[in-house]
């Protein structure tokens, strides 16, 4: 969990890539109960895999659907992910910008980065603004052709998310490219 642009979805993709697992991205806002159950069963049947439920707080605020036209019921989702069907081989990743909007039945943060509901959500990880070293690496990678911009970028992007750092560097690089034209 964490602010937008911190790399939550990118982390899920990187985990899938690192372990050579398919990433099954469930678009909850477009699913009804049957769609969700069918997609879950298909993923379990074809496991090992990763299921990504992205921006969960955009679909449910606690147990209440955010969109009145939504056809996926929270209880169906809950029963499916913790149901009687063996889900071994499935890594479930849920991302959210607002962990306070996640219902306790899914699992809430404890002081040890674990969940109050192991078996549904086992670990809770916060992704925030970038620390200096990874920020430097990202900046140097994006601005490799303009090292003179890197020092300023490092100083000017404190407390930025990864997406904000990337956008900042791209804008600086575009200015340099336009100067050449």
Regions found by a protein language model. Give the residues of each.
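C-terminal alpha-helical "lid" subdomain
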Residues: 109-181
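Conserved nucleotide-binding/hydrolysis micro-motifs of P-loop NTPases
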Residues: 30-32, 56-59, 97-102, 129-135
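Conserved RecA-like helicase motor-core motifs
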Residues: 22-27, 126
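Walker A/P-loop
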Residues: 1-24, 38-45
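Charged, alpha-helix-enriched surfaces in structured cytosolic catalytic cores
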Residues: 10, 34, 38, 69-72, ...
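Conserved catalytic/switch belt of AAA+ P-loop NTPases
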Residues: 57-123
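Conserved alpha-helical scaffold flanking the Walker A/P-loop in AAA+ ATPase domains
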Residues: 31-59, 72-84
């Amino acid at each position: 969990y964490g602010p937008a642009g911190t790399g939550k979805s990118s982390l899920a993709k990187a985990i899938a890539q690192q372990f050579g697992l398919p990433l099954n991205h469930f678009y909850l806002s477009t699913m009804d109960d049957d769609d969700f159950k069918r997609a879950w069963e298909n993923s379990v049947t074809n496991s090992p895999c990763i299921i990504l439920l992205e921006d969960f707080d955009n679909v449910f605020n606690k147990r209440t659907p955010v969109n009145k036209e939504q056809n996926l019921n929270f209880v169906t989702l809950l029963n499916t992910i913790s149901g009687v069907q063996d889900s071994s081989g499935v890594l479930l990743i849920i991302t959210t910008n607002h962990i306070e909007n996640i219902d306790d039945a899914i699992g809430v943060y404890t002081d040890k980065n674990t969940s109050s509901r192991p078996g549904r959500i086992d670990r809770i990880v916060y992704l925030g603004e970038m620390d200096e070293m990874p920020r430097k690496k990202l900046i140097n990678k994006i601005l490799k052709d303009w090292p003179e911009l890197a020092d300023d970028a490092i100083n000017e992007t404190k407390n930025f998310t990864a997406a904000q750092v990337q956008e900042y560097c791209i804008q600086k690089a575009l200015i340099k490219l336009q100067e050449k034209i």
